[in-house]
Amino acid sequence: RHPPARAAPGRLRPGTSAAVICTVLLTTLVFGLGMNVSRVRSRSTRPLHDLALYYLPFATGLRPLEVARLTVGDYLLEDGSVRRESRVRADVAINGRDRPLFFNHRRLDEALGAYLDERIRAGHGLGAAEHWRGLDPLGPLFLGSEGEVYPITPNGREGQNRYVCRPLLEIYRKIFRQADIPGLCTQSARLTLMSRMYERGADEDQVGLVLGIADRSAVREQLPRPLPELA
């Protein structure tokens, strides 16, 4: 059995901004990830790459295809600092709708920073040395072990406009096996994020904004908001 993540004190107030929601939630979630992070680190052949990937769905609700489409410039500013308030661009989002994306936690910064440092040492995806930490801002945030771009291929019938990044999907399956949490997948990570948002007092609109779900009813279908207990 795996204990639930520790809850940070306090609840979100109505109207709390999406940026504050994500900051509070990631702070809460990482309390429960420590043991699993250690397993991933010790079992992975690419621990820096895989740890950064492991944190992302819990922190942001991003899907594997969206992760594959992220660029260095989505995460970094030109001066090399973290882009705290970013966007899931329309051409990145699975549903084709732009939405907010926040990078607001030290441990996620450390994981992504260590991975990008490793890329620089390996000479993968480099750009001008004085900008974006020396990386190409238009290049993918995550690359394969030899610096190759993860391929994104059509998935479904012609004209359906559906795509998949199969290598990254398989990497995520491997990472979650290494974490040794039965049933864990990127969708369950998204549901975990939704659950924590509800626990903090977020409503369906706030959940949908962060996770890229436009319809309140679709949010409820994935994970209904718990009803308040009667006194």
Q: Model segments located where?
A:
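Flexible interdomain linker/hinge and immediately adjacent N-terminus
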Residues: 1-33, 148, 154-156
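Conserved tyrosine-mediated DNA breakage-rejoining catalytic core shared by Y-recombinases
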Residues: 69-109, 120, 125-131
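Short, charged phosphate-coordinating catalytic segments
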Residues: 57-82, 205-209
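Short, basic (Lys/Arg/His-rich) helix/loop patches that form interaction surfaces
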Residues: 160-161, 166-209, 213, 228
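Active-site/catalytic core of tyrosine-dependent DNA strand-transfer enzymes
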Residues: 105-181
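Catalytic-site neighborhood detector that most strongly recognizes the C-terminal catalytic loop/helix
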Residues: 211-231
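N-terminal DNA-binding recognition helix of tyrosine site-specific recombinases/integrases
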Residues: 1-12, 19-20, 61-65, 113-126, ...
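Basic, Lys/Arg- and aromatic-enriched nucleic-acid-binding interface segment
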Residues: 32-60, 64, 190
